[in-house]
Amino acid sequence: MAPTFSARRGHNSTRGMDLYEWQRGCIDLGKTGTSVIVRAPTSAGKSRVCDAILMHRLKQLGGVALVVLPFVALCDERSEQIAVGLTGTDIRLVRMYGGQGGALHNWQRDTIVVCTPERANQFLTQAIELKRSRKIVFAVIDEAHMLRDRQRGGAMQGILTKLRMCESEAQVLCMSATMKDRFMTTLATWLGAVTYSTAFRPVRLHVYVKRGNVLYVDETPSRELSGGRDIDHIAQLTNETIEMGGSVLVFCQSKISCETTARALRPLITTASKIGVHNSDLSSSDRVDMEEAFRAGSVRVICCTSTLAMGVNLPARRVIIRGVHRNTSDGMIQQMIGRAGRAGLDAEGDAIIFDEHCQYTTTPDDDRVHMHESAATRLVVETIASGLVKTSDDVHRLIDCAFASDARSRVHDAVKWCQENGLIAWNETSETWSATKLGSGLSSSTMSPELVSPLLHRIQRLQRGAVLSSALQVIYLLVPERVGGDVCVTPRELVSDMCEEDVEAARRIGVRPFDARFVYAVALNDIIEERSTEHKFGVSVGDIEQARDACVRTGMDLCVVCESIGYGTVASVIGRITNRLISGSKESTLELTRIPHIGALRARYLARHGIRTPEDILNLGSVDALFAILKKMSRNVTDGILIKSASNIFTAVKKMLVEKAQDISDLIVVGGKRKYPEIT
């Protein structure tokens, strides 16, 4: 059984650095080099613990540290935090998520890689192939309760299984706010780790269950609410929080419920506070703007879906859980509750659960973890392609190293499926397994194995008759089978407004009635051709953006797979269009849109002024010169905002060019003594 540590007390300050006592104890434990499974409430300070142990490990051994988070928004947030801590050091920060980052070339330089589970899994496979896995000295898995998740869990399990199998000396840190006891103990035993658990929260939390007009605490009536026009009492609960200077998150069952709740609240809020909506109908930039407005206090109430609790750290004084889906887990409810109370701003926070509208499932404290078919298939292909698995004995060792209770049957079934589908081959003479070219390509991508065959079939059709002057066919190839929400236009309506090249591309696609994939493909094609899409397709900006993100992931993966099987020309075409989907622009402005704070519209304006590359921006000579150009473009934006944008662009360009130079000189090792942030 794994050793267990527990922290119950509060705050400790030593050597000029404020740390909670549980943080001090956990950091001291982590500095011994042992792997640790940490459970601590939201806002307890897990990230600070992670950073201290990580930096100690890099200072002690040097090498590469993986920071794995389940969502791109969390990766963005963590990257910014880590970047601040690395100021003045020689440690490199690499972002591998959301279309950013590629292979790591300079393994001699100390590096922190922030990545999603899928990219971390891909990175580790490449490291094993290159015999560089021993360079990975630290790996943190944040939100580790998601090891059981059907989508992200497989990649997380794959990372840890391969670290065990390649006999890596990497120290592992798994962190969660909602991991249950038996699962935590089983995970620690599997990894040879110790557990560290604390219930300490820097902000006191009060949890109420609302039934009718009464709030209960542990089945005991605590308070009766008044009635009036506010039938559900949401306005009353919101108003009293705003009057105390606080903010409110209202979790709703659906996107429609978010909108209707916000509309109902607006006339009932007694102050001039703004009410916002946060759901997948918004574009990512609109969601970021809403989050920033909430943090700044210009928006005091957000009506949101449960995804906000998972994808972004946005605490509030009060959390109201008005409704959730029937299949919502109690772990997700805990994530929502954990948003109550803002450390450093509130002395306490409270969460109110509407019992009559919240039917969620109670997850049993079960130590069993299952391996899904797709995850098992990827694990088999990756371990064979990387050379970890060669013989039948190695297959058994893979099973022994896996976490899932059903690993034996899943792995054997996956080996059979991979062989039947041409991903791996058995050599009767040497009695060894090897990956085919297709299997190697799949291993180097993040693609689901079951998608490879149908996508290659589509590519072969594309090769027989592609309209090279239009991107529509390639985009249609990339759009997933199940895409977005309902569409309000038919493909035939859209064809009537198309240019000649796109009409021919549509003819070769074979337009079918009610083909949502085609509608989304046309929308995305209009975006990269810089045409207006407003109100044209009857779908939300958020749905179009999600379709674009799915196309980008598929496009990046297909480039890798196509290169591996000799379809280099196809890979080049798909790669160019994928890059345009990332930027939302024509090829002429592609390089500019890779710069942070420069979107497609701003890139087009700069290009008209002869600025087409990062070097052109730097050659302007000053922030003031760039500000003058931006001011001509943005007449309705204040000078202060534009100066900040110009400064941010200049800083980003300098950083990009430095990193570009470092990539070119991969073999040059940074000389002199390493510099590290001070750690207590």
Annotate each PLM feature:
Residues E382, K390, A404-A407, V411-A425, ...:
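C-terminal helical accessory/scaffold domains
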Residues G323-T362:
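Conserved segment of the helicase C-terminal RecA-like domain
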Residues E118-N121, I128-V172:
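SF2 helicase catalytic motif II
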Residues D28-S35, S47-L61, T161-L163:
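Walker A/P-loop NTP-binding motif
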Residues T161, L173, A177-R263, C358:
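Conserved interdomain linker/interface between the two RecA-like ATPase lobes of SF2 helicase motors
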Residues V301-V324, D350-I353:
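A short beta-strand element within the Helicase C-terminal
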Residues S47-R48, G63-V84, N121, A177-F183, ...:
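Conserved Walker A/P-loop ATP-binding site and its immediately adjacent core
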